[in-house]
């Protein structure tokens, strides 16, 4: 929301500066020394109108003795800053070594964690799959390594290979009729079954994933998409209510709720959903399309075919293929882009777009 700076010169003059991401009035800047205020001013700032001032702190005062605090309009603390001098003689932290080769790592947990770390922090010289495969060479049923291998291949579209790993992961998790504490493998298998069109199995699997708090919102959103595409709007809304209860910032779920309410004729309820999304995400393309005039929406999208494709696919996944076609036809009428034509051909079943 805001940024601030404080610097002290050799002459004892202290410079303070503040700016904000939007126009703010009634903010208060305070600088204190040993808990006692030595400077205080009420200010107004805006991105194009930053605040800057200076005052005399006196000779011999060091910056580490001063604390700068920014208060909001109601007197609450927004930010506080006290300079810190670092001792350059302090030894540096331990250097990160290149990870050992998978076969040289003593235990499977460490081997798995090295692979997982390199999934998180990309290293072009390390292939995380090598580490997961080494774990599975030692223990073919390892749940965590099988899960990561399944996710890895799902993302790359190799659904059959991914499903094999995920089912192996789930097999050990669910032994003795156990409901797994970690539903990552179950959720990802549900995504694969949905993508393959095996809807009954996808529904069953995704419902199992809703038992886990982490995956409840995501799994319920996927279920809502399935029901929405089937025209089962009441069932979809039931899933969406739970998805939003578990994650109030699941804007995909809130947008889908808005689309379904609109389809059911509840335009007021739909508008409230899109307004809620835009309050936190003012550049959300789906909510803007449902809110702006066609001309204003085109200006926002800037004739970018990939942005139109992403939005159209989102509508398609939400069960609103007619909207997806309308979006793609709109950009196709102004920009010649092969991938747009490919998707139009797929969605409409018309070969003319391939010519």
Regions found by a protein language model. Give the residues of each.
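Residue-level recognition of tetratricopeptide repeat
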Residues: 116-117, 151, 191, 225, ...
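Canonical tetratricopeptide repeat
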Residues: 148, 181, 188, 222, ...
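Structural marker of alpha-solenoid helical repeat scaffolds
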Residues: 138, 172-178, 212, 246, ...
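TPR-adjacent "capping" and linker segments in tetratricopeptide-repeat scaffold/adaptor proteins
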Residues: 90-112, 176-180, 294-307
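TPR alpha-solenoid repeat register
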Residues: 145, 178-179, 185, 219, ...
């Amino acid at each position: 929301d805001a940024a601030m700076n404080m610097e002290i010169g050799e002459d004892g003059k202290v410079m303070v500066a503040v700016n904000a991401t939007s126009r703010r009035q009634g903010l208060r800047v305070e600088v204190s020394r040993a808990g006692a205020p030595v400077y205080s001013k009420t200010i107004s700032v805006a991105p194009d109108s930053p605040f800057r001032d200076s005052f005399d702190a006196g000779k011999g005062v060091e910056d580490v003795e001063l604390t700068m605090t920014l208060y909001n309009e109601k007197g609450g603390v927004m930010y506080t800053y006290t300079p810190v001098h670092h001792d350059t003689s302090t030894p540096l932290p331990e250097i990160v070594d290149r990870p050992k080769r998978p076969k040289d790592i003593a235990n499977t947990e460490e081997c798995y964690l090295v692979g997982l770390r390199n999934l998180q922090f990309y290293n072009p010289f390390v292939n995380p799959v090598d580490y997961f495969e080494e774990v599975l060479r030692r223990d073919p049923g390892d749940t965590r390594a099988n899960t990561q291998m399944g996710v890895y291949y799902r993302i790359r579209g190799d659904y059959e290979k991914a499903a094999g790993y995920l089912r192996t992961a789930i097999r050990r998790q669910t032994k003795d009729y156990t409901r797994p504490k970690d539903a990552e493998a179950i959720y990802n298998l549900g995504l694969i079954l949905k993508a393959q069109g095996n809807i009954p199995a996808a529904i069953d699997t995704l419902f199992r994933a809703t038992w886990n708090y982490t995956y409840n919102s995501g799994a319920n959103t996927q279920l809502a998409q399935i029901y929405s595409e089937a025209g089962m709007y009441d069932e979809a809304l039931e899933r969406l209510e739970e998805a939003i209860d578990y994650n109030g910032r699941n804007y995909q779920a809130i947008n889908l709720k808005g689309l379904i309410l609109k389809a059911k004729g509840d335009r007021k309820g739909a508008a409230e959903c899109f307004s809620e999304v835009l309050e936190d995400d003012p550049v959300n393309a789906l909510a803007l399309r449902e809110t702006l005039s066609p001309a204003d929406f085109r200006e926002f999208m800037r004739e970018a075919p990939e942005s139109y494709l992403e939005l159209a696919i989102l509508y398609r996944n939400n069960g609103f293929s007619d909207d997806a076609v309308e979006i793609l036809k709109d950009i196709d009428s102004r920009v010649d882009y092969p991938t747009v034509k490919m998707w139009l051909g797929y969605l409409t079943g018309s070969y003319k777009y391939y010519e």
